């Protein structure tokens, strides 16, 4: 389970190279946004048959602009993405669902970027004050993203999983993803060291502003 790649092909490849014996890859959105390697990321998704939903940044790309209250960094990244993305890959993003209800090994799974109640913008942090709301859902597992903070929490009969980010982790510098053994219902969050400096150097050559790398310095 992965999320919030944000055009970081270096992070995505690091995570994929760590996977062994995996049958499915699920993504909770934000394939695009911030960093410039969006075509490489989308092509990798296609090659690996990743099951994914849209995130808010993916929707900004589809809309051609971010909302007025968003930061200049986000608005600039939308303009950069519009110039970079291929026609085929734009169609791929446009055709992703806002949410998915699927069944895996007789378990009902909801995949959504933000929350079941606000698909794009609500953030379910580890200290979310209203976790009891999840008890009302007729599912076994909710997979979400958006916060860039990993979470594995069981509320009643519902397991809530946020894999963290393999593109822009915000709690520490290590990339984050989650393994789910669907036979035993065991979830494990994993963290990986990656080549931050190499990524920053290459992204800067593509015109990414320095402010988008501050997050990596802030959490060292």
Give residue spans per PLM region:
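Short acidic-hydrophobic surface loop/beta-edge motif
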Residues: 98-106, 153-155
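Acidic, His/Gly-rich catalytic cores of divalent-metal-dependent hydrolytic chemistry
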Residues: 154-220
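Anionic-ligand binding region
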Residues: 124-161
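Active-site-proximal beta-strand elements of phosphoester/diester hydrolases
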Residues: 1-6, 108-115, 160-164
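Hydrophobic/aromatic beta-strand patches that form the interior of the parallel beta-sheet core
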Residues: 26, 51-53, 110-112, 143, ...
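Active-site-proximal segments of metal-dependent phosphoesterases and phosphodiesterases across multiple
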Residues: 69-76, 106-137
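Active-site environment of divalent metal-dependent phosphoester hydrolases
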Residues: 6-11, 33-36, 59-62, 118-119, ...
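Core catalytic region of metal-dependent phosphoesterases/phosphodiesterases
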Residues: 2-94
């Amino acid at each position: 389970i992965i999320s919030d790649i944000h055009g970081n092909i270096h992070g995505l490849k690091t995570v994929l190279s760590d996977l062994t014996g995996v049958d499915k890859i699920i993504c909770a959105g934000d394939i695009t946004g911030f960093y410039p390697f969006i075509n490489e990321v989308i092509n990798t998704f296609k090659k690996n048959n990743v099951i994914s939903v849209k995130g808010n940044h993916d929707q900004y790309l589809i809309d051609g602009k971010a909302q007025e209250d968003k930061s200049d960094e986000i608005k600039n990244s939308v303009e950069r993405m519009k110039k970079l993305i291929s026609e085929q890959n734009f169609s791929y993003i446009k055709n992703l669902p806002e949410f998915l209800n699927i069944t895996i090994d007789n378990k009902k799974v909801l995949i959504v970027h933000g929350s079941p109640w606000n698909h794009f913008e609500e953030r379910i942090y580890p200290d979310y004050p209203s976790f009891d709301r999840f008890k009302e859902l007729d599912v076994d597992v909710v997979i979400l993203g958006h916060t860039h903070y990993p979470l594995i929490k069981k509320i009643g009969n519902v397991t809530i999983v946020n894999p963290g980010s393999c593109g822009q982790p915000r709690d520490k510098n290590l990339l984050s993803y989650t393994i789910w053994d669907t036979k035993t219902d065991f979830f494990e969050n994993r963290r990986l060291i990656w080549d931050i400096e190499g990524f920053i150097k290459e992204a800067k050559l593509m015109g990414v502003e320095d402010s988008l790398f501050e997050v990596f310095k802030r959490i060292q």
